Amino acid sequence: MEDRMYKVFSPNDSKVAMKVIPGHFVTTHSHITHYVDMTTLRARQNEAEAAARILASKYANNTPVDSIICLNGCEVIGAYLAQELTKSGIMCLNAHHTIYVTSPEQDINGQMIFRDNSKIMVEGKNVLILSTSITT
């Protein structure tokens, strides 16, 4: 499978690359023709920071963000995204004028939950959800 892999580079920054593997992949709800591996993008500091810069440019001038909820292990990107949005002067309604970066926990049924101590980061906030996994 690795020999079929190729990289797709962002036109905005060559540091941002996703590995793509063509094939037939089955999930419980869909069939897909390409697997997009974002492991290094979400784990390497320089790639995560570059990806965050690109993402921030889409939100910086027109979208208030109080909290970033990170799914699928993208907390590194989320932290850099919060930093980039803060640098750009994005509107944030939090008392400390900083963006929360958090991840939900899972209960025994696999449902995402926020415990009482982290609910203040999401309830009534302008939330940006950052995920590295989507499917049809």
Please place each PLM-identified region on the residue numbering.
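PRPP-associated nucleotide enzymes
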Residues: M1-T136
